[in-house]
């Protein structure tokens, strides 16, 4: 029998995809992008630090890093955890000098009607763990006496008093402090209960009052994170000693990865593994999907951020996929909670039909407004507040200025995919669902047989059946937005709206994903036109000729020729007369 040769395992650092415990990351020799230089900046900042970023952006690992750095119980592990990092060579005065208390409000399962019970249960669990870990430092019987207190507010106050008595300092971390806020945003009927919790004698307000009362004494530092500033504003007068650093330029790069950090990671793995693509080639694939977040207006034009979770997802799958580009570029868990998206859609639909912010972004490719640092829940329907909420959720990002206002765009294809997917909900009434029409087969024939008419006829039929009278009033904006949303569902293409090139603007360019579908044969550039229901056939013909001339110019641009690669480019003119497609023709 022939001897089976075992391939020698290549050593490489683990990819910390999905890991949120800093100690595990370091002890298991994972690749860690060094964010410890920010420890110095945090220590020089206000002792009560608020920081907002989109979900699944690396916040939890950053908190874990800080906890391990400041934990008085981890003194003996300082060298093993931080010795090879920046802060290991540049330690700060406060290292390993705090008792760490970590609360995660996402772990509170109770709703607003019994939020006190849920908060009490979570805090009691964390407070008991705290007392056990630091029993050798706390006064005798602290744990037993703490458990005799009636609720979380009383227990927190008691622990702060005991630490003050012993000359100890607590570093309090609160992760997802605004988790329960999603209920009020997603379900309007909860607004009254939310206000009761966050105003006046509300329990959550009382909890933050207790934190405020311990400030400057036993509660040495507080670090609060979440995804929305809404609750922060409603709690402001109860906790008015904190500083919101979410939009500060010095902390723009604290979570997420810069392109240089992504390149360094790829270069490392390419040096120890048989990569089939260069770093530049991988960046070309990743950048449109994961990059382009800017969290500070002062940083625009200098540094954009990649979603770190998505980068790790891509690298992990690229390696597991035998060094081929993964077909699935969007991690399932990255999708924003469905209820939250429904909330955004609900609020957006409450605007006048000509003032829909999401529609504006889809139609023009951008929107403008003023970025608000915080705002109360009851004023979420103010346009600037709603736009700012989209920003904090990661649905739009800063893209410079326009006519004196901040310009916002969809940051990348991961977000665009989510926005267009859920935007379809705004075009459906009573939660109707699209019939499939064997949509998968239509998409395959579009990509491999050049059969565009059945595909665009399918879109036109869906548009006609699911559009309300209010949608029809939007005219061209509605047709354009609906078509974009539908084409975004096709896995073979990345639809780009109003492609900016040297020949002008094309309405939609279906950029073929050749790196994933190497045998794809067809690509499309589409000029969408809209005319009113009463438009004559003669006027329609004139509109077609006008669109044909435009699309020929677009198709000859360098950017289109580069993107289509080996596929056949189809130049299409699609004209809607009202809500019905009147023409779908290829221009030779």
For the regions a protein language model found, what residue spans apply to each?
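Conserved P-loop NTPase "ATPase switch" module shared by AAA+ and STAND
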Residues: 166-197
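Walker A/P-loop-proximal flanking segment of P-loop NTPase domains
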Residues: 2-71, 79-87
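Substrate-engagement module of ASCE P-loop NTPases
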Residues: 158-165, 193-220
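Amphipathic alpha-helical segments of the small helical/lid subdomains adjacent to P-loop NTPase cores
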Residues: 231-238, 245-316
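Extended alpha-helical interface modules used as scaffolds for assembling large macromolecular complexes
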Residues: 242, 305-555, 583-588
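Structural recognition of the conserved hydrophobic beta-strand(s) that form the central parallel beta-sheet
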Residues: 172-175, 205-206, 220-227
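Domain-level recognition of nuclease-like catalytic cores that cleave nucleotide substrates
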Residues: 559-588
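P-loop NTPase motor core
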Residues: 18, 34, 71-132
């Amino acid at each position: 029998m022939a001897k089976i040769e075992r391939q020698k395992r290549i050593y490489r650092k683990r990819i910390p995809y999905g890991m949120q415990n800093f100690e595990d990351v370091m002890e298991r020799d994972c690749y860690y992008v060094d964010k410890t230089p920010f420890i110095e900046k945090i220590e020089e900042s206000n002792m009560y630090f608020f920081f907002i970023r989109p979900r699944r952006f690396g916040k939890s690992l950053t908190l874990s890093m800080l906890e391990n750095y400041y934990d008085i119980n981890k003194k003996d592990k300082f060298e093993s955890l931080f010795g090879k990092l920046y802060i290991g060579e540049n330690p700060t005065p406060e290292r390993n000098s705090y008792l760490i208390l970590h609360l995660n409000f996402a772990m509170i399962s109770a709703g607003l009607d019994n939020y006190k019970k849920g908060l009490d249960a979570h805090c009691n669990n964390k407070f008991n763990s705290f007392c056990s870990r630091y029993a050798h430092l706390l006064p005798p019987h602290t744990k037993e006496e703490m458990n005799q207190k009636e609720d979380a507010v009383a227990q927190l106050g008691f622990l702060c008093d005991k630490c003050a008595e012993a000359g100890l300092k607590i570093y309090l971390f609160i992760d997802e402090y605004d988790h329960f806020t999603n209920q009020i945003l997603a379900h309007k009927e909860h607004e009254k209960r939310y206000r009761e919790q966050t105003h006046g004698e509300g329990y959550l307000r009382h909890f933050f009052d207790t934190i405020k009362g311990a400030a400057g004494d036993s509660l040495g530092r507080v670090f609060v994170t979440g995804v929305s500033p809404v609750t922060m504003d409603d709690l402001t007068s109860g906790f008015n000693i904190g500083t919101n650093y979410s939009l500060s330029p010095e902390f723009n790069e604290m979570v997420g990865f810069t392109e240089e950090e992504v390149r360094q990671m790829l270069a490392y793995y390419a040096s120890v593994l048989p990569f089939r693509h260069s770093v530049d080639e991988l960046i070309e694939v990743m950048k449109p999907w994961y990059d382009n977040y800017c969290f500070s207006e002062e940083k625009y034009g200098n540094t954009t951020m990649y979603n770190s979770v998505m980068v790790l997802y891509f690298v992990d799958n690229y390696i597991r996929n035998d060094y081929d580009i993964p077909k699935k570029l969007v991690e399932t868990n990255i999708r924003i909670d469905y209820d939250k998206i429904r909330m955004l859609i609900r609020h957006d639909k409450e605007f006048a039909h000509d003032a829909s912010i999401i529609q504006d972004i889809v139609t023009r490719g951008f929107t403008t407004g003023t970025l608000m640092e915080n705002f109360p829940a009851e004023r979420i329907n103010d346009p600037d507040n709603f736009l700012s909420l989209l920003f904090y959720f990661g649905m739009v990002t800063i893209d410079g200025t326009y006519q004196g206002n901040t310009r916002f765009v969809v940051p990348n294809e991961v977000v665009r995919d989510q926005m267009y997917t859920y935007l379809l909900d705004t075009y459906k009434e009573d939660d109707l669902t699209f019939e499939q029409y064997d949509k998968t087969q239509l998409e395959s024939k579009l990509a491999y047989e050049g059969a565009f008419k059945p595909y665009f006829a399918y879109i036109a039929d869906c548009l006609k059946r699911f559009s309300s009278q209010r949608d029809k009033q939007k005219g061209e904006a509605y047709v354009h937005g609906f078509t974009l949303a539908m084409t975004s569902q096709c896995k073979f293409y990345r639809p780009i709206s109003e492609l900016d090139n040297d020949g002008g603007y094309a309405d939609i360019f279906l950029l073929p994903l050749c790196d994933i579908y190497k045998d794809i044969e067809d690509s499309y550039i589409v000029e969408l036109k809209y005319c009113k229901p009463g438009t004559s056939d003669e006027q329609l013909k004139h509109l077609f000729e006008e669109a044909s001339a435009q699309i020929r110019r677009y198709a000859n641009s360098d950017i289109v020729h580069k993107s289509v690669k080996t596929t056949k480019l189809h130049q299409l003119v699609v004209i809607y007369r009202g809500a019905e497609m009147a023409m779908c023709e290829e221009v030779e």
